[in-house]
């Protein structure tokens, strides 16, 4: 993923481990709320991402086929500032913690590692990778929640 992933109105390709274009993060400009679509290489929308407008805490919503898939928000009462809670539509909770702004964090389910996000500084472009650990994990969901937690962390930093 490119480091400038989260510019509204910007589009960014996500490449697989072979360097092939696999997903497109399509930033939607001129919207009342921060909005993206994650598309496959053929242009089909896999998930939609938007900021919830009227929430007490900053919240991002991930939808698939118009139905809520997950909500993402900073974890309450956490000693760690960079700790986010993802609640899936079925009530399952995922935990994201680490150095979000440094692009160094992990996604866990019930203490089991699902994915690791880390910087890759040895490339020509400033990029970071999402290493999906579990074979049965949903890549589109993990990419979408990565977009969400980085956006929320950057927004929180701007508001300080």
Regions found by a protein language model. Name each.
Residues 1-160:
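Intrinsically disordered, low-complexity proline/glycine-rich segments
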